[in-house]
Regions:
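Metal-cofactor-binding active-site regions of metalloenzymes
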Residues: 1-307
Length: 307
């Protein structure tokens, strides 16, 4: 009797485990993807691991493939940081946001350097360290891809004015919006302020543009229309805040590359015409250039007659 109960418990645990690893047929792909990685993030927090440890594990796992030349690190901006401790003034909120962005970049670069030191047992001599890294790469023991940070904005379900609540108008007009709000215009303004801060930093700190390389918008496409994020994409390439060159400490002029665009679109739609429309709006209204990306854009590969 005891062995039977023990076996039943084993089956239950095994079933619960595989439910999280094997995608069932009744769950759509994107929803499963979101649920799985949300649980993974929560597991890291429960285990007491900080972000630094997570970054190092990412580098360790990805660098095993020496064919990887570039590695994108996606970071979601912390909008809550701007309004901690009751800070509401725009100047202070902007400064806090820029500080948060720079701390994120510093954390990624620092952990990548620490990973490289861990690979070859760094002992303080830079020239020897570089030689060891080159030999490690040439021998095929590990890869060292270049790092690119992409700021990732999530499309969210928003609250409309179903009950006549017009407080979001006051938020937008006064500039004292709460850090987290689902009112669509408040959320859009926060994203615009964030991309403006990103580009101002890229244009004022030498070499930073080589690390912050792009912005991305993903998550459930049906939650938010493209027009919600169009102002953010246009703002970050506005000539009023972008600069073509920057001078470093040695007096050399450095070219500032354009930030890259990715927008996940045409991947989840109720009708194929909606998918086509979203793709068209992104290309037409987001100031896209050569090299910018459409995320998946599955609608373009669908046979219309079969649909």
């Amino acid at each position: 009797m005891y062995k039977r109960q023990l076996f039943i418990q084993y089956i239950r645990i095994k079933s619960g485990y595989f439910q999280q690893l094997v995608e069932p047929n009744y769950i759509l792909g994107l929803n499963y993807f979101q649920r799985f990685f949300r649980m993974a993030r929560n597991a890291e927090k429960i285990g007491g691991r900080d972000e630094s440890h997570v970054y190092r594990e990412i580098f360790k796992s990805q660098a095993q493939n020496i064919n990887i030349k570039k590695l994108e690190i996606r970071i979601t901006p912390d909008f809550d940081v701007a309004n901690k401790n009751g800070i509401q003034k725009y100047e202070l909120a902007e400064r806090m946001l820029k500080k948060s962005i720079l701390l994120n970049v510093r954390r990624v670069i620092t952990e990548y350097i620490e990973y490289c030191k861990m690979i070859v047992n760094y002992e303080g001599d830079m020239e020897t360290w570089y030689a060891q890294l080159n030999k490690c790469y040439e021998d095929g023991r590990s890869g060292f891809p270049s790092i690119g940070i992409v700021y990732h904005f999530q499309k969210r379900d928003y609250l409309d004015n179903k009950i006549g609540d017009m407080c979001w108008r006051k938020y937008v007009q006064s500039g004292t919006a709460p850090a987290y709000s689902k009112h669509m215009l408040v959320w859009r303004k926060q994203i615009v302020n964030c991309v403006k801060a990103i580009e101002e930093l890229r244009s004022s700190i030498p070499y930073l543009a080589e690390y912050i390389v792009g912005i991305d918008a993903a998550s459930n496409e049906n939650s938010m229309e493209p027009w919600m994020l169009a102002p953010a994409y246009r703002t970050i390439r506005n000539r009023k805040i972008t600069k073509p060159i920057i001078m470093n400490d040695n007096g050399d002029f450095l070219r500032i590359p354009n930030i890259g665009f990715t927008y996940h679109v045409g991947e989840e739609f109720r009708h194929i015409m909606s998918g086509f429309r979203h793709i068209s709006e992104v290309i037409e209204h987001f100031n896209y250039k050569a090299g910018d990306r459409l995320g998946h854009a599955i609608a373009l590969g669908v046979d219309v007659d079969q649909w």
